[in-house]
A protein has these predicted regions:
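Acidic, proline/glycine-enriched N-terminal capping motif
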Residues: 1-102, 237, 247-248
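A short, charged helix-loop
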Residues: 87-128
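Flexible, active-site-adjacent loop/turn segments at secondary-structure boundaries
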Residues: 50, 54, 84-87, 103-106, ...
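Short, amphipathic alpha-helical segments
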Residues: 61-65, 114, 127, 144
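Basic, nucleic-acid-binding surfaces and adjacent catalytic neighborhoods in DNA/RNA-processing proteins
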Residues: 1-17, 30, 35, 121-251
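Short histidine-centered catalytic/ligand-binding loop motif
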Residues: 60, 103-113, 164-171
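Noncatalytic, beta-rich nucleic-acid-contacting surfaces in large DNA/RNA-processing enzymes
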Residues: 56, 70, 117-119, 175, ...
């Protein structure tokens, strides 16, 4: 790294990555859960989580001065990896023994047919009743790749407050929440990610967020009321107190 980062973790000494990767050819790429992974010949892999920002740099472009890893190719182009808050960049040969890496691979993805209502309700039943809906959705990688950024629109579309206890959800609300997890994540994926994030080439995602740093000052898209922004469980939450009640509406 040109700029050491206190909260960027490597599974080898950073100086060893040169020897581990030099001479290998990129053969593919994969994404699962919170990880993206570059695949090289010889079984070598470079994986990084959602706290790492990779950026493709063309041959004629100037390299940034600060980065945590610079991967240069023989044609003069490169990928620069930077970390804002925290992240991990790991080089391995299929033997990476990391809890979140394993969960990202082994857990059932919300983008698959296997993630049905029955499985979702099993997940709900497996956690403590007093757990909040945000904690259920965004911690422990129960749903690979679903984090704080994605859950904002899921909860808004479901009409559920992020601080609601799991035990307070009715069967109807559980069904709606499952459907919105599936629908919102599928839409985000198809549209190239959220507009609050950038892709490998520096372009923002095509999914227009409803509840995010881009929209919270504009008011609720459903009722026009004020959107609340506050810190909760290690990250900002955005919600409409009118549309997302702390308890189910009685009909």
């Amino acid at each position: 790294p040109s700029s050491p980062h206190k909260f960027c973790w490597f599974n080898h000494e950073p100086e060893e990555y040169q020897a581990l990767l030099a001479g290998h050819t990129v053969t593919g790429a994969a994404g699962f859960g919170i990880f993206s992974e570059l695949e090289f010949d010889g079984g070598v892999r470079l994986c990084f989580n959602d706290g790492v920002n990779p950026r493709f740099i063309r041959k004629e472009e100037v390299r940034p001065k600060k980065y945590q890893l610079l991967l240069e190719f023989t044609d003069g182009s490169a990928i620069v990896f930077t970390v804002a808050m925290y992240g991990s960049i790991s080089c391995h040969s299929g033997d990476y023994d990391n809890e979140y890496y394993r969960k990202s691979i082994e857990s059932i993805s919300p983008l698959t047919e296997e993630f049905d209502e029955g499985y979702f309700k099993e997940l709900l039943a497996s956690v403590k009743p007093a757990m909040s809906v945000k904690a259920f959705l965004a911690t422990e990688q129960r749903m690979p790749g679903l984090g704080n950024g994605c859950l904002q629109d899921i909860l808004f579309q479901a009409g559920i407050h992020p601080k609601r206890k799991v035990s307070s959800l009715s069967d109807c609300e559980k069904n709606v929440l499952w459907a919105q997890v599936k629908t919102v994540l599928q839409t985000m994926t198809e549209q190239g990610g959220r507009d609050t994030e950038k892709d490998l080439f520096g372009n923002p995602g095509g999914y227009q967020t409803l509840m995010s740093k881009n929209t919270w000052a504009s008011g609720c898209p459903a009722c026009g009321g004020e959107i609340v922004k506050e810190n909760y469980l290690g990250g900002a939450v955005y919600y409409c107190p009118s549309c997302q009640k702390m308890e189910e509406e009685k009909r």
